[in-house]
Amino acid sequence: MRIAILHNRDHQLLDDDPGREAREDVERVAVALRDALSSSRREVELWPVAEDVFEVGRKLQTSRPDVVVNLCESLAADSRGELVVPALLELLGLPYTGTSSLGLTLSLHKNKAKELLRARGVSTPEFCVLSTVAELVSVKMPFPLIVKPSREDASVGIDFDSVVHDKASLGKAVGRVLRTFHQPALVERFIEGREIYVPLLGNQPRRALPLTEIQFGAAFENKPNVISYAAKWEPTSAECVDSPSGPCVLSPELEARCIETAMAAFEALDCRDYGRVDMRLAPDGQCYVIDINPNCDLHPHSGFAKAASSAGINYPDLALHLVELALEREHGNQAHRKEGPAAARRVAGSHRNLLAARAGMRARANRSRARGD
């Protein structure tokens, strides 16, 4: 079996990239997955993606690996490019791990994601989107509020100053997002309470791995309990040291409610294979979805990998399971477990290649015009 691991390599493109550490981490994950998947029966290759996605497409069209592990989270240091590689893989008819281009698009644009969640009856904090500082007068929600970039992941753009308690600090936080990230600011009601993560694995059936909770320590005394960029990506910072994740202890009823809410959110945004749903649990027991992370961090020391380990799934088995999910979606059966025949059947089925199908349609149309039909 030939496996291609695609990952973005764009962390050096911008001198002032505010998400540099998150983009750098993807390469480490790619190497870890390559090592976990490599065996005498599997050939695994790393394919970095920088800016020229068309060259990647040509290489994929020529090489046609049996399955692609998609780790691309941006393109040319722009998070909106996250959808480009899966869309390309869909056009080429290549099976790949993780959420589709549609699901990634819906999840990335946080305001659209929240609109869909609300339409499905999934609890999420009240919110609004501001494209200019002048729109501050339209904000009617009660404080405290939290201000985030509207289309970033991995806590990019979040720090203690993101949680605001008055109009003046709200204006500063919104202005900072607009200037730094060149995108609208998402303003939502800040939910005081516990921060809980629900990791999800699989499709039919989908299962919840053991829930985890952030333990906010001394660095958060008299500060908002919020996972900032520093807490997530700067391991020597006090915010990171004092916000470890650990087992989440809930009553059976409350745990079931959190899992049900997470499952509904994942389904609403067309997510698949694996991911994590982040929640705030209010003192009254109401759980609110604050973020959905399809294709979440797969580093061996990530929260997702640790949750899988707690469920009895070691890292190599987790990596192989994600590959199997992609192949099952492509072939609809377990033939791929033989690590060979399924791939031959896929390559022979050229009708799966949408580019080839479109080329055939164009050729037929040209012949029809030549005949004067």
Regions inferred by a protein language model and the residue ranges of each:
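Active-site nucleotide/adenylate-binding loops and adjacent lid/helix of ATP-dependent enzymes
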Residues: 1-7, 61-64, 104-194, 204-205, ...
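ATP-binding N-terminal substructure of ATP-dependent carboxylate-amine bond-forming enzymes
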Residues: 1-97, 101-102, 106-108, 131-137, ...
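Short, acidic Gly/Pro/Ser/Thr-rich loop/turn segments
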Residues: 10-13, 152-154, 205-208, 216-219, ...
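Short acidic, glycine/proline-rich loop/turn micro-motifs
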Residues: 14-19, 156-159, 302-305
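Hydrophobic beta-strand scaffold residues
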Residues: 44, 95-96, 124, 145, ...
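ATP-dependent carboxylate activation and anion-phosphoryl transfer catalytic cores
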Residues: 116-121, 249-373
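Phosphate-binding site of ATP-dependent enzymes
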Residues: 167-260, 283-288
